[in-house]
Amino acid sequence: MTSNLNLLPKGFVKLDDDGTIIETGALEQESDCTEFYEGVIIPGFVNSHCHIELSHLEGVFSQESGMAGFIKQIRVQRESAPKERRVEAIKAQMDKMHKDGVSAIADISNCDESFCVKSSSPVYTRSFLEVFGSESGDATNIMKGLEELLSTALSCGIDASPSPHSCYTMSRELLRRSSIAALDSGYISYHNQESWEEEELIRRGKGPLADDYKSRGMSTPEINPEGPMSYFIDVIRGKGENRIPGEKIEGNALFVHNTFTDKNSIELATKTFSNPFWALCPLSNIFIHKALPPVEMLRREKAAITLGTDSLSSNRVLSMIEEMKIIQRYFPSVPLNEIIGWATING
């Protein structure tokens, strides 16, 4: 989506008295009112994946724990601070992102703690109300709670919609029902192929996640040797009279992380979804897995890439600039104008 974007030397932005942008272009001649800024003037950043609710966990988690270790830390630490402090941390990080040039955030919400901050923030947020649960018998009650959370979000004036978490934390029943509800809204956000443990669990029914779930008496997903993306699509497509009709599934599909995705998964998603996007959170991937997504492969497959920060439980800072820097550091062949596009217009 960003291959035709180019940086404009001596570019200018002309503002009205109230700050409204009224003209942009290449500066031919300076005037007395021209203000020069060293650097690049760009549109507002779009943080396409964030868990702002976890802002109170800054500096708490151990790095390189793997997904199973990360989940254990979440279970122990998520509510380790009082609610008042959690809300204060949310506001502080929302304010910081706005100051750093973020104009919109695709944020994951598991509860309503961020709603009051979002409703008064100058930053636009699209809240994906995320659910998870490994037992099929719990799906109805979880979906009922999701409907109540959605009602609360809408009453606060927040744009929100249902969202599944991922194949490795959900029963087939809950994954399908929450995904259908998300697609009905026109938007779905989904954690995809974030860890090698996820791959092991879905492809072989083995690995640290499988061991952890079994030790806690939890159900594990059915094995799909073709991998998590195939599993996800099989579940939401459905079968027989419940099968989603049409050649492609309509709506905007945001696949998040993709650290261990492959060519077959990318092709399958492109073939199945009408408008797929691929959100990368490289600093989070390094923090948890000491790994990075296959950026060059995604580019070769002409994937629509976006950038996100994830949360302060898996990142040292919520900074779009730092995410862009890490892309430049490890993938120096990617042009700056393309990375800017990922961080802005694609999001």
Model-derived features: where do they sit?
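C-terminal helical cap
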Residues: 88-97, 277, 281-288, 330-347
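His/Asp/Glu-enriched, well-ordered alpha-helical/loop segment
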Residues: 291-347
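N-terminal metal-binding scaffold of metallo-dependent hydrolase/deaminase domains
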Residues: 1-30
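Active-site loop-helix segments enriched in His/Asp/Glu that coordinate
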Residues: 81-161, 165-183
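Active-site gating loops and adjacent loop-to-helix segments of metal-dependent hydrolytic enzymes
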Residues: 56-88, 126-129, 196-250, 272, ...
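Glycine-enriched alpha-helix->loop->beta-strand junction motifs that scaffold or abut catalytic
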Residues: 121-125, 181-187, 248-251, 268-279, ...
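Hydrophobic faces of well-ordered beta-strands that scaffold small-molecule active sites
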Residues: 44-48, 105-106, 125-129, 160-164, ...
